[in-house]
């Protein structure tokens, strides 16, 4: 892909947008920048990084009317809007940073492991990256997990990697056509981002774009949407918590198996919860697909300590355990967290619901939860969806109040679980900030 003499508008000026500007400028493009709202301080900050950069704000259509060949979109901006559809119909091209990286790795021959899913993708990405590094591969971990892929590429100054381990969101896959992963997985599909997609099937179709090419497909055999993503003529590895598969959990023994072969006991895996058994199986399958030896992978799994804010025990007071799952930002993630914990629960839910249906939590909560505490802007909707199923629902103004009230009701042996099933931006700077407030509230008890 050549950018010489191409006029490109980069839309969205967060980390991904900045990395696209830097990469495209380095490769000879004439680049301008757009954001719907731009403060003078932000313009000055970015202007110091890129001399002579032209900025546009306001209506995207007005910016696009300036003769651009390509629109480079940050993931937060949907291309499903009339201005962008008209741009494409008039011959304009729309792409994102993953498409730009795909062009690089396709030419250079780098291997790629690509990971998406409604839940678990960050844990699996981190675990796969950890295993690749431990096995001696020159590994780049990037994408939705934090480091924009083009920022990572620029830092490497064009050096080929043994493997790129990419966490990809559905937003990033919307305008990615050329990525051909060596191995890829969709961990699961549950309600998320339905404010952006027509329905759950539309969302699942977007996730399935990760399987372009002829690489190994790693599929969740327990998920009806994932099972349907199998493509003809491809090598497929399936994992299951429910029944025998290529990789599966033998419930009676707590052993992960490959066919009839014992792999590792769940007692030897530091990650808590059944959902993490699925994460481990997917990670091992992905790593084997790029040629890493199983024996070494299983030994390194035993030393992976997981990620903060994901079903993480933060402390205990008078026998009451407090667990942080602030990264549980949708119904599926929260249901998985609840399913993986055995003790009676007091669960804190709420925030920005993103158009989700919370009724699936009724079954997840009814046999385990002694109480549910609701916070945030969509607390009323969660109450409506859970009402009448026998749960004790309590509205709280703040997260601190929810922690205090839950602790007051809990007994030794109970768990207070923060797993909101919602985004955090109505009350917090992000899920990490929400976690910090939860931890401080626990310490203040």
UniProtKB/Swiss-Prot annotation:
Organism: Neisseria gonorrhoeae (strain ATCC 700825 / FA 1090)
Protein's UniProt keywords contain ATP-binding: yes
Family: Belongs to the MurCDEF family.
GO MF annotation, one: ATP binding
Keywords, comma-separated and alphabetical: ATP-binding, Cell cycle, Cell division, Cell shape, Cell wall biogenesis/degradation, Cytoplasm, Ligase, Nucleotide-binding, Peptidoglycan synthesis
Cellular location(s): Cytoplasm
Enzyme class per UniProt: ligase
Entry EC no(s): 6.3.2.9
PANTHER family (alphabetical): UDP-N-ACETYLMURAMOYLALANINE--D-GLUTAMATE LIGASE
Pathway: Cell wall biogenesis; peptidoglycan biosynthesis
Gene behind this protein: murD
Gene Ontology annotations of biological process type: cell division; cell wall organization; peptidoglycan biosynthetic process; regulation of cell shape
Chain sites annotated for binding ATP: 117-123
Cellular-component GO terms for this entry: cytoplasm
SUPFAM superfamilies, alphabetized: MurCD N-terminal domain (SSF51984), MurD-like peptide ligases, catalytic domain (SSF53623), MurD-like peptide ligases, peptide-binding domain (SSF53244)
Domain of life: Bacteria
Reaction catalysed by this enzyme: UDP-N-acetyl-alpha-D-muramoyl-L-alanine + D-glutamate + ATP = UDP-N-acetyl-alpha-D-muramoyl-L-alanyl-D-glutamate + ADP + phosphate + H(+)
Pfam family for this entry, one: Mur_ligase_C
Record function comment: Cell wall formation. Catalyzes the addition of glutamate to the nucleotide precursor UDP-N-acetylmuramoyl-L-alanine (UMA).
Protein name per Swiss-Prot or TrEMBL: UDP-N-acetylmuramoylalanine--D-glutamate ligase
Primary location class: cytoplasm
